[in-house]
């Protein structure tokens, strides 16, 4: 087997439990003003210098900079609670990191946005994705093509949503399917589960695997769910089948949230997050004729419960050299981003 490279970074944050929400047709738009930016880099940079929201984020960072418990090497939110990293990708010379950002003026998950040349030094950008018609913008992944970047994520209460952007700094996003894959409503009996998606492309067909859990294990215990869908146009999606075959590594009670699927070395990797034991991965073989993944090896990034302080919620992208770069979430109770490390210090004695 050829050498496999997995680069991992930690993402300092805190956790809020996933709630169950009633089905609603639509939710109000964000209280944060959504702006449109120019389509060329020179004008975008000039507009960002004067942007009031970017200035606000800079002021938040300035407030925290002298806090001894503020993470320096690891990315953390400019304000408020920080949830999962999402949609890590490389586009036109920059690394882009999206994350579940809960602004103080509208305490719902938006996709925050930061850009970097080296995956270490990050610069805040305006919010990328705003909730509505979905209640909140949960986890998902991106796919960078030659002419655009595709984001696919779980929109709370409606299903998986597809959005695209093609400008130099990925500032302007258009939702092309809301939802692309509708959520399974209460009382519906369907062979699949709709939650966090990962997206890729084979030939001219897009594929998405939605990870999560179903109560189909022994004694109605939760079991991981990996449902495969396909589309030719990003708008109309067809359910194919259960993506993972002959998987014997995960016990009842595990789930497969925040999935990512990609070739690595001469095999394939399936990254995911269990709400029981944190970030994990499966290596195996992918049958392109069947469009099924056959895992043969299981590994963990986290060796304890993911609460508190565990490594979880991976966001990944190809490094362009046959490897995969992964950024994980790391949380500690419901603390502001600048006080996360203080929690570990106080509980390390």
Residue locations for each model-derived region?
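Phosphate/diphosphate-binding loops
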Residues: 316
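Bacterial Sec-dependent N-terminal signal peptides
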Residues: 1-26
């Amino acid at each position: 087997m050829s050498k496999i490279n997995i680069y991992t970074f930690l993402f300092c944050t805190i956790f809020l439990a996933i709630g169950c929400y009633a089905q609603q047709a639509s939710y109000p738009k964000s209280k944060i003003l959504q702006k449109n930016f120019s389509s060329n880099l020179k004008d975008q940079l000039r507009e960002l210098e004067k942007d009031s929201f970017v200035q606000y984020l800079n002021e938040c960072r300035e407030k925290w900079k002298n806090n001894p418990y503020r993470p320096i090497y690891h990315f953390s939110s400019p304000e408020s609670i920080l949830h999962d990293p999402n949609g890590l990708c490389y586009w036109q010379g920059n690394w882009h990191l999206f994350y579940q950002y809960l602004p103080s003026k509208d305490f719902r998950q938006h996709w925050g946005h930061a850009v970097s040349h080296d995956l270490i030094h990050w610069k805040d950008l305006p919010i990328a994705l705003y909730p509505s018609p979905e209640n909140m913008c949960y986890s998902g992944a991106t796919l960078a093509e030659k002419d655009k970047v595709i984001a696919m994520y779980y929109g709370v209460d409606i299903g998986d949503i597809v959005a695209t952007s093609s400008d130099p700094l990925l500032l302007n996003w258009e939702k092309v399917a809301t939802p692309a894959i509708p959520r399974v409503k209460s009382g519906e009996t369907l062979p699949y589960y709709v939650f966090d998606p990962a997206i890729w492309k084979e030939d001219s067909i897009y594929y998405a695997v939605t990870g999560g859990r179903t109560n189909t294990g022994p004694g109605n215990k939760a079991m991981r769910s990996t449902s495969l869908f396909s589309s030719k146009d990003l708008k109309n999606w067809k359910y194919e089948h259960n993506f993972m075959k002959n998987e014997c590594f995960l016990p009842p009670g595990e789930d497969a949230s925040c999935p990512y699927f990609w070739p690595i070395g001469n095999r394939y990797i399936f990254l995911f997050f269990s709400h029981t034991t944190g970030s994990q991965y499966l290596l195996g073989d992918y049958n392109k004729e069947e469009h099924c993944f056959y895992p043969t090896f299981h590994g963990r990034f986290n060796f304890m419960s993911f609460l508190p302080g565990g490594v979880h919620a991976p966001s990944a992208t190809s490094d362009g050299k046959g490897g995969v770069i992964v950024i994980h979430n790391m949380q500690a109770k419901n603390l502001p981003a600048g006080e996360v490390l203080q929690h570990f210090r106080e509980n390390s004695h």
